[in-house]
From Swiss-Prot:
This is 2,3-bisphosphoglycerate-independent phosphoglycerate mutase. Pathway: Carbohydrate degradation; glycolysis; pyruvate from D-glyceraldehyde 3-phosphate: step 3/5. NCBIfam families: apgM, PRK04024.1. InterPro entries: Alkaline_phosphatase_core_sf (IPR017850), ApgAM_prokaryotes (IPR023665), Metalloenzyme (IPR006124), Pglycerate_mutase_ApgM (IPR004456), Pglycerate_mutase_ApgM_sf (IPR042253). The gene is apgM. It comes from Thermococcus kodakarensis (strain ATCC BAA-918 / JCM 12380 / KOD1). It holds the Pfam family Metalloenzyme. Belongs to the BPG-independent phosphoglycerate mutase family. A-PGAM subfamily. It is an enzyme of class 5 (isomerase). SUPFAM superfamilies: Alkaline phosphatase-like. Its EC number is 5.4.2.12. It comes from the Archaea.
Length: 411
């Protein structure tokens, strides 16, 4: 029995809702995607709910579910996964947070992402905060990708029941940090002190002075959320399926998930996780990994960002960009030897500007696949596909079975 290789491609936030300016089509249906459509014709389509029907999923919990883990059991907050993703060496008693560089004016958050500042700017600003802010505990503050950053409070894991200051929409003041016990109260007080001192450093930083002169929103405030401790992973993905697994990822959160479950993670030069990401660099790295790894995970972020930005046209353009990436991969592999699955971690409809509970399009093609009669890759075609509507955690077992790597249950 020939064992095949597996390629899981996640186009972050892929699913959407009908767009009036597209004649009622979704961005995926509107986009020109000859490569994914070719796979749809030779493969099988369906829909998947990353958690359960109608439940909006975070990128962290969605990815954990898709890789076969029960997020209700293993998830311990986003922050720790972000920290793993930026390569920090953490201890089990550390407490980590996801942070946004944001813009504040007269006590009101005017932009939760500070105009989507560049990764280079974020890293320089984070360095200034780390060097100039003093706290009663040891801490690490580093930039991640784009407007994202990570904060780690050393030895404060017992205070994980702390809230956040992120109002989750512009036009509102920052929230006050809530707490549930004495340990989390200590953490809340430290976070308040950190945010205030960081604001003083950021507001007068040369990068923000330059941004103001250019008419760009300054990254002069920090929104902190997602308190997290070490995830409770019962068994590594690589151990469970007895495969060598590699991943091509630019975004720190998803890197953290992949590292936590045993993947070797690669970020080729030019892969930014932003609209300008070099898809050919990611495609070439994916083809390279498929030579040495049994299972490869390729992540693409810009589709999600366009949904959050309520930009249907840009989302369609990013889907087309992803299709070109997929086209390169198809030119350099033998589909008889590889099982490909393409989906999103969740839906990010432009009208919602956030994650929703809408089901996510799913495509599986390659060796061993019994094709259905679908013609293209889109939300409505997926509704009539042969896979039906499944849970996110069913995707990998289906792939592994087609790869001839599953074990029989029973005699």
């Amino acid at each position: 029995m020939k064992k095949r290789k597996g390629l899981l491609i996640i186009l972050d936030g892929l699913g959407d809702r009908p767009i009036k300016e597209f004649g009622g089509k979704t961005p995926l249906e509107y986009a020109n995607t000859p490569n994914m459509d070719r796979l749809a014709k030779m493969g099988i389509l369906g829909q998947q709910d990353p958690i359960k029907p109608g439940q909006p999923a975070g990128s962290d919990t969605a990815h954990l579910s898709i890789f076969g883990y029960d997020p209700y059991k293993v998830y311990r907050g986003r922050g720790f996964l972000e920290a793993l993703g930026v390569g920090l060496d953490l201890n089990e008693d550390d407490l980590a947070f996801r942070v946004n560089f944001a813009t504040i004016e007269n006590g009101i958050i005017t932009d939760r992402r500070a105009g989507r500042i560049s990764t280079e700017e974020a890293h320089e600003l984070a360095k200034a905060v780390q060097e100039n802010v003093k706290l009663p505990v040891d801490f690490i503050f580093v930039g991640a990708t784009g407007h994202r950053a990570v904060l780690v409070l050393r030895g404060m894991a017992k205070g994980y029941r702390v809230g956040e200051n992120d109002p989750h929409e512009a036009g509102k003041p920052p929230q006050e940090f809530t707490w549930e016990d004495e340990e989390s109260k200590k953490v809340a007080e430290i976070l308040e002190e950190f945010v205030q001192k960081a604001h003083e450093v950021l507001d007068k930083h040369p990068i923000n002075e330059k941004r103001r002169k250019e008419g760009k929103p300054p990254a002069n405030y920090l929104l902190i959320r997602g308190a997290g401790t070490y995830p409770d992973i019962p068994m590594k993905f690589t151990e469970q399926w007895k495969v060598k697994a590699g991943a091509v990822i630019a975004v720190s959160l998803v890197k953290g998930v992949a590292r936590a479950i045993g993947f070797d993670v690669y970020t080729p030069e030019g892969a930014t996780g932003e609209y300008n990401t070099d898809v050919m660099a990611k495609a070439k790295k994916t083809v390279e990994l498929l030579k040495d790894y049994d299972f490869v995970f390729l992540h693409f972020k810009p589709t999600d960002a366009a949904g959050h930005d309520n930009n249907p046209k840009l989302k369609a353009e990013m889907i087309e960009k992803a299709d070109r990436m997929i086209g390169y991969i198809l030119e350099h592999i033998d589909l008889e030897d590889v099982v490909i699955a393409i989906t999103g971690d969740h839906s990010t409809p432009c009208e919602v500007m956030n994650h929703s509970g809408d089901p996510v399009p799913l495509l599986i093609a390659g060796g061993g696949v019994r094709p259905d009669h679908t013609e293209s890759f889109g939300e409505r075609e997926c509704m009539r596909g042969g896979i039906g509507r499944i849970k996110g955690h069913d995707i990998v077992p289906i792939m592994m079975d087609l790869m001839n790597r599953s074990e029989k249950f029973g005699a």
